[in-house]
């Protein structure tokens, strides 16, 4: 059974078959940007499964393998005879060529990585309105030596004679580059050409349409039963709260567990915003004291995470029993979690899908089985950027919708070493200054994350003609599209100066501010 058939009533217009590319999810996101619903499935998805889904088109992703290798991942050859338009990207194009009778060989001294100008030979169909000379992103070590019968060249580059190919009669197309990445200047034009003009899709994947479908699905699933949501204040759980309130009203109970590791003023803001301003009932659980006691003397970051996660589950269990009974638990599973768990993890030797546990929303995945919740996952079709759009449409304020990612364990993992109340107060004040100044400079929405880290060492300083021996604060600001990779943000010097001066002068116990200029990889965004 195809993993997408459990995704609700809507069937995908475009199916992406994943061959291990780091860009497979990005292809799906780019298709969705054209307001066409797309999903990612494993490359072993059979032609029969695809026929049952009845997509308007299929895209074969790139991948790290060589099509002529013994253990190369291959698609069902019957796919070529479905009569559905197919676009092969990089490895996907090479697979198309190889399976249809062409030849792919290792590039001898002509591998292409990075940007390359595309010379258009046939500006029709896939390449309509794509300017010759447009920059495309190349990443391949193999090349097409001979095209299958019925195929012709659409474009070339200096090192790749067959950079784009087509069999117009069978509506089969291939590109040796990656149109989905931002470096490919004409990439979105090609994707629109394929989706709209070749596949004949309609732009019906809109935020409003999703909300209507999600509301109807939730009402149908839960009926008149009670539903529980663990509210963290992040964009996912906040969007869920608004969506569920719209769908089932007072059947929803939100539980906010304040573990004492949130940023300054956040617990008060959340209660004021949800419970009083928007009349969404929130049960506030003050568990600060029990969490900080559990971390007494703990310095190892993984142990801190484990303790916080375990304690969260215990508190959640206790309070859900007290407030319940509840029939349903809302989880913030997003589409990347669905892809990871069932869609694309395939053993190349057997072709079998390998299940990976879906990430749990806000640490509720380890709840005791005797609580017997049924899961409600209204956002499981969406990528993160789509969740933000839904939140805006539902009326969430920008300060929540555009909130920078914040780890579940909160400030506890931005304090290196042991967590104490004194350090938490110090870090809260420093972190608030960072966010205030980045926002005042108009850079908040241009930066993926901007925050402060407290180090477990002290440094010598001079303040008011007196020697000080206090903590240093690390300023961590990164730019990213999805958090998988990130570059350190080049903040203006005058902004860094303002942040540093304010922290040193206003935050008790700090006498030095340093800047983390490490990208991911090799570093991670968070320090713990």
Swiss-Prot record:
GMPS ATP-PPase domain location: 205-403
GO CC list: cytosol
Enzyme Commission code: 6.3.5.2
An example molecular function term from Gene Ontology annotations: ATP binding
PROSITE patterns in the cross-refs: GATASE_TYPE_1, GMPS_ATP_PPASE
Record carries keyword Nucleotide-binding: yes
Binding site for ATP: 232-238
Keyword set, alphabetical order: ATP-binding, Glutamine amidotransferase, GMP biosynthesis, Ligase, Nucleotide-binding, Purine biosynthesis
Function: Catalyzes the synthesis of GMP from XMP.
Binding partners and assembly: Homodimer.
Name of protein: GMP synthase [glutamine-hydrolyzing]
Species assigned in the record: Synechococcus sp. (strain CC9311)
